[in-house]
Amino acid sequence: MSASHILNSIIAGSDMAWNQDKQRLLVQGEILVETRSHKAWGGAVTAWMYVPMVRSQVWQQLTDYPRWVQYFPDITKSEVIHRGEAKRLYQAAQKAFLFFTAQVEIYLNVVEVLGQQIQFRMEKGTFEDFDAHLELKDCGNGTLLAYTVQATPNIPIPSIFIQQAMNFELPANMRKMRQVLCKAQ
């Protein structure tokens, strides 16, 4: 199956106009991002990234949840608090804004579909809502990773600012994630 066919199947649910140039950029290392609004004070984003590693290796590292502090610099703690069929995670993060630093924490229910996807749903935390989804697909000799997040903070920040922050920060975080994943190879 060609990388182009796989890319088209992954992005079929997206509103983004995909073409050969965007697909080529993705395989060459670009992070492609699509933001959208989510409630009045929230935002949603999907980022796509190609990782030049086989899916089983990527999966093994992504499901090592304490390592997420290496992937996302704002995450200060990531720990599994319950193992089993349904995992529970605790994550804490700190983000500096213009004149203040926001500290957040979240308890997540995690559902894994072995080697294919990870779903994170907020159980409780300092968000009004939070939902994230990671999907992995084979793509040539590597893996295509799609990461979707939708969140609404407890503090009223206009949606446009949340979307801009997601659009700016998620690609940098994804590059860091790819760097850490490939370094461990």
List where the protein language model places each region.
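Short loop segments at secondary-structure junctions
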Residues: 53-55, 113-115, 139-140
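Generic detector of well-ordered alpha-helical segments enriched in charged/polar residues
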Residues: 8, 23, 162-163, 167, ...
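Short, well-ordered alpha-helical segments
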Residues: 57-64, 168-172, 176
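Hydrophobic residues positioned within well-ordered beta-strands of beta-sheet architectures
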Residues: 19-21, 45-47, 89-90, 106-108, ...
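Membrane-targeting and insertion segments and their boundary/processing signals
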Residues: 28-45, 103-106, 140-151
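Glycine-rich portal/gate segments that line the openings of hydrophobic small-molecule binding cavities
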Residues: 4, 36-41, 50, 69-124, ...
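Hydrophobic ligand-binding cavity/cleft-lining segments
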Residues: 1-84
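Beta-strand/loop substructures that line and gate deep hydrophobic ligand-binding cavities in soluble
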Residues: 121-168, 172
